[in-house]
Amino acid sequence: TNNIKFLKTHTFQKIKLVDGRGDTSKIKVDNKIINLIDESYNSNPLSLKSAINNFNSLDIKSDRKYMLLGDMLELGFHSERLHNQVIKLINSTSIKNLYVIGGEMSKVFKKLKYYKKSNVLNKISQINDLIINNMNNNDYLMIKGSNATGLNKYVNLLKGFKSVL
């Protein structure tokens, strides 16, 4: 057990997460510092479940957590069923500030408990409005979606320039 404790404190904490796979950044938007959790590299049922569970388990007040979910793509005729599987998981979390983008996630949004709903975004540029109009300084925003949704490009813009507006 001493070896495990050593690895935990000296090795694993030094591992840098790959961009888009759970890495965190502090970004500045409209004079607000936002803690961005970037899960935007891709999305599939397992990685989405893991990201939601990890975000939910953070020791942060639930009203400080914002989650933006984009579609999981390339699921073929299983798409609707696999998107619907996430409804029960989202409803079981303490996360109340939920935003979605994309056709499949918009359908999921309609089936969520009323107190989980925040808004459906129609275009990626509305993320700025989400941050400016709804978030406070030091709030947390997790973004998760498939590459083809374009969320990863937007997140890279946020992280690269540190100020979008």
Task: For the regions a language model picked out, list residue spans one by one.
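ATP-dependent carboxylate-amine ligase
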Residues: 1-165
